[in-house]
From Swiss-Prot:
Record InterPro entries: Acyl_CoA_acyltransferase, Leu/Phe-tRNA_Trfase, Leu/Phe-tRNA_Trfase_C, Leu/Phe-tRNA_Trfase_N
GO molecular function: leucyl-tRNA--protein transferase activity
Keyword Acyltransferase: yes
Primary localization class, coarse: cytoplasm
EC number of the protein: 2.3.2.6
Gene3D superfamilies (UniProt xref): Leucyl/phenylalanyl-tRNA-protein transferase, C-terminal domain, Leucyl/phenylalanyl-tRNA-protein transferase, N-terminal domain
Function (record text): Functions in the N-end rule pathway of protein degradation where it conjugates Leu, Phe and, less efficiently, Met from aminoacyl-tRNAs to the N-termini of proteins containing an N-terminal arginine or lysine.
Cellular component annotations (GO), alphabetically ordered: cytoplasm
Family: Belongs to the L/F-transferase family.
Provenance organism: Azoarcus sp. (strain BH72)
Record-given protein name: Leucyl/phenylalanyl-tRNA--protein transferase
Keywords annotated in UniProt: Acyltransferase, Cytoplasm, Transferase
Lineage: Bacteria, Pseudomonadati, Pseudomonadota, Betaproteobacteria, Rhodocyclales
Length: 235
């Protein structure tokens, strides 16, 4: 049994999360900035489907990627050097989250509900949520979005309509964060794709201990739209 949250973000300790399903901690509550910031600082994130209440998660172990340790294969480095894609930051956040929300298969569902989209658009307006976009011939063909809090980045979702488009976005994000001394990219759930890019699992207690440092340090929230791909050297 998990607790039902009501009018304030009083999350239970993450150690009380279920082991099956892994990380389910609480239900209910809201998706206001106050709730989201309180959750992320504690290593908690919302994830649920249409028709369900808001569900809050903190899985153990946690998949993370240190920005400096991203694994760039020879073929990906060739793509990056060739600058086939134009990479932009925070110029099409609403479109990125819309593309991420599109079902992966015909008739499939999505956890990026209209309520989730509205909540993260608000966080983007406040300078906390960001997008990294891969453009090809003027078309948005890949990208990702997530939350930055202090020196921690919490990845939410990515999409790709052209081969390597999301990998290029992730590579630029990692380099951008490394240059700004970010401590971690939280990948939340383990996937083969992220493992292949250099992500690894750590214990939840280690992750949450790091958040106590990372989320109170670093720059204040602000848009990243002034960043250009010309800042990055892939040689």
């Amino acid at each position: 049994m998990i607790p039902w949250l009501t009018d304030r973000p009083a999350f239970p300790p993450v150690e009380r999360a279920l082991t099956e399903p892994n990380g389910l901690l609480a239900a209910g509550g809201r998706l206001t900035p106050e709730w989201l910031l309180a959750a992320y600082r504690r290593g908690i994130f919302p994830w649920y489907s249409d028709g369900e209440p808001i569900l809050w998660w903190s899985p153990d172990p946690r998949l993370v990627l240190q920005p400096a340790q991203i694994r760039i294969t020879r073929s990906l480095r060739k793509v990056l050097r060739g600058r086939r894609f134009e990479v932009r930051f925070d110029t099409a956040f609403a479109r990125v989250i819309e593309e991420c929300a599109a079902p992966r298969e015909p008739g499939g569902g999505t956890w990026i509900t209209p309520e989730i989209r509205a909540a993260y658009l608000r966080m983007h307006e406040l300078g906390y949520a960001h997008s990294v976009e891969s453009w090809l011939d003027g078309r948005l063909v890949g990208g990702l979005y997530g939350m930055a809090l202090g020196r921690a980045f919490f990845g939410e979702s990515m999409f790709s309509r052209v081969s390597d488009a999301s990998k290029v976005a992730l590579a630029h994000l990692a380099r951008f964060l490394e240059q700004r001394d970010f401590g971690v990219i939280d990948c939340q759930m383990t996937t083969p794709h992220l493992l292949s890019m250099g992500a690894h699992e750590i214990a939840r207690r280690e992750f949450c201990a790091g958040l106590e440092r990372w989320t109170v340090e670093g720059p204040p929230p602000a848009k990243w739209s002034g960043t250009t791909a010309a800042e990055f050297d892939w040689n």
